[in-house]
């Protein structure tokens, strides 16, 4: 990020959420707008990712629907340094266990 001006309150934050399981990693990005800065923007949980329109989604993060017990499932494809892939399918309530980093990677003044 080139400039994170504290005097510009209304803006568009690009947020990067990184996932990891073992040596397999991946990320998604999305835009969050409004009158907030810093930690207030980063205060997300897995519910913020539900039905999110991602700016970038190289891991093909997606919802799989409910099972017979009513549990929501998600899937994503993570990669290691050798570009080997790992398909992750798990129940929605476990999603937070895969999140290893949340960061602001871009900010633009909202016009």
Curated annotation (Swiss-Prot):
What are the entry keywords? Plasmid
Its recorded name reads: Uncharacterized protein EF_A0048
Organism of this sequence: Enterococcus faecalis (strain ATCC 700802 / V583)
């Amino acid at each position: 990020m080139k400039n994170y001006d504290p005097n510009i309150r209304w803006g568009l934050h690009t947020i990067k959420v990184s996932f990891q399981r073992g040596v397999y990693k991946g990320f998604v990005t999305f835009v969050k707008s409004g009158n907030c800065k810093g930690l207030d923007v980063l205060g997300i949980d897995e519910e913020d990712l539900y039905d999110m329109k991602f700016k970038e989604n190289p891991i093909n993060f997606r919802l799989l629907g409910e099972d017979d017990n009513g549990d929501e499932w998600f899937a994503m494809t993570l990669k290691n340094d050798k570009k080997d892939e790992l398909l992750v399918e798990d129940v929605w309530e476990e999603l937070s266990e895969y999140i290893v980093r949340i960061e602001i990677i871009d900010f633009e003044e909202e016009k």
